[in-house]
Amino acid sequence: MRFSKAVVRGRVAILILTVLLMIPAVFGMLETRINYDMLNYLPDDMDTVIGQNALLEDFGKGAFSFIVVENMPEKDVAALQEKLESVEHVETVLWYNSLMDTSIPMQLLPDKLYDAFNTGDATMMAVFFDTATSADETMDAIREIRSIAGKQCFVSGMSALVTDLKDLCEQEEPIYVAIAVVLACVAMMLFLDSWLIPFVFLASIGAAILLNLGSNWFMGEISYITKALSAVLQLAVTMDYSIFLWHSYNEQRAIYPDKCEAMAHAISATLTSVVGSSITTIAGFLALCFMSFTLGRDLGIVMAKGVLLGVLSCVTVLPSLILLLDKPLQKTRHRSILPKMDGLAKGVTKVFPLFLALFVVLAPVFYFAYDKTNDEVYYDMGQCLPEDMEYVIANSKLSEEFDIA
């Protein structure tokens, strides 16, 4: 109770401190680098990582891309090659004139060599960079190559995929976070007993999410998967804590007329229930840190940190906001559309052997379904990207015209 009473007494100071902490949190979030290269999360002793490091250190070649050029005269392709070679961090551009002078007709080449560069009205060149696949410099070079090459050229390769993936995530992340917030608001306004309380919850959880994203700065960088998932996951995982505090506060208000005393007891009751649950959740996320594929560590640390900040916000920021807005919250109360579940609860406890038997019967069915789902797991990121994305179009042309997947 000592902690609970301290929160109630210092509610104004807590809110002021939270607002002040938002400033460095925003800067930290903006300065945290987002990593789009899954190779960075593989163990250093894997052949792929060893090979990439050897190429970069011994030969000065890191990332590479294939460029398919359609319906362009040979002299224009040669001019394009010269322009691409001048792009910063482009180490080498390989095409026909890397082997022979363009004054010598391509048709004089042996068929096997000619077919390696040409098919129909299309020709192909390979671009090698002196930086890693997902380095910021490589992505900038990909964008510059696309702007130089024009609509007749299609840039494929892992670096092109990473560049498009970054642009797509930055474009769509605010959209699906906004959708999650709107849906959560609508659901809570309908199923809780106040029209205003969902927005109070979101303010409290939003502060915790922002602090979590800002504190990622100390990690140096996070993966794009972590960035894409963390905000929505944190919202979903910690929302229950806020609902529990609100229900506990309303129950205590019926016992204690003074709102501050009621809130102190509500915080104490919430801590008792939420701490055990949150520790289990945090432990589950931290278990990801033991994966050899260190994306698990990346996601595990960020989400464990998010749950911890969510709990702290639930028992400090949220009570302060509720006490500050107590009058409008009480005025906007309404009947919940959810019916009482007492009858259902009693019914379930009476026939619980039936549910146990049902579980035993269905478990093998769902295990079989799970096993079949594992057969369909894919690891090609290109399969989950929109068909009109530049990388997907370029990769399709490379596969169809040059039989390079």
Short names for language-model regions:
Residues 35-66, 72-79, 92, 353-405:
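Juxtamembrane segments of multi-pass membrane proteins
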Residues 45, 49-50, 75-131, 163-167:
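Extracytoplasmic
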